[in-house]
Amino acid sequence: MSRAKELQEKLNLQAKLQSTFSNNTAAVLDWLKESDETGISNDTERNKQLKDHKELEDGKKAFFKLPVLQIGSGLHFRTQDDASAKEDIHTIGEFIEGDKKVSSLAKKKKRSDPGLQRNNMYRITKDDTKAMIALKRKMRKGEKEGLRKKQEHSKSSVSNSYSASDEEDEDAGTMPQKSTKKKFGLLFDKKKKARK
């Protein structure tokens, strides 16, 4: 019998709650009718409300036109249409209202602009294989050695031209040069002070 009492109490409570809600709704509807009857007395107030509403809509449109950045990329204002651009999300409006996939934001795009790529053929990129990396390093090393040899050759030719004129001056008066050994005060050479 207690189960039946519980159900009856719940039904009574629901009825009271529904009655309270309907009374509140009726009171609010009465307030709205009164405000409609009095209306807006001034056209300037109405114009102000329309102006505020228009500003709000313009702000909303401007917000929806803001660009969305893909992960790992920067802002670019490209006017050309790519094949993948139709699938990607580029503005906040496309993100909120569009049916495009959000996963397109996570895709890292490869730079296709030749102006953005550096003209260094020895630069190692993440797409290079181990063999290509080894080849690029070998080519870079060969280039460095070639430059080094070229520099040494140019230094030796310059020093040879000066050496002929210097031989005459050296015979006239050669002074021995003294070189002193540099001393560094290293900590491990010093004896440690005894602790008291």
Curated annotation (Swiss-Prot):
InterPro entries: Nucleolar_19. Pfam families: NOP19. Residues 142-155 have a biased composition (Basic and acidic residues). Residues 101-196 are annotated as: Disordered. It is found in: Nucleus, Nucleolus. Keywords: Nucleus, Ribonucleoprotein, Ribosome biogenesis. The keyword Ribonucleoprotein applies. GO terms for cellular component: 90S preribosome; nucleolus; nucleoplasm; nucleus; small-subunit processome. It comes from the Eukaryota. Present with 1460 molecules/cell in log phase SD medium. Ribosome biogenesis factor required for cleavage of pre-rRNA at A0, A1 and A2 sites. Essential for the incorporation of UTP25 in pre-ribosomes. This is Nucleolar protein 19. It comes from Saccharomyces cerevisiae (strain ATCC 204508 / S288c). The gene is NOP19.
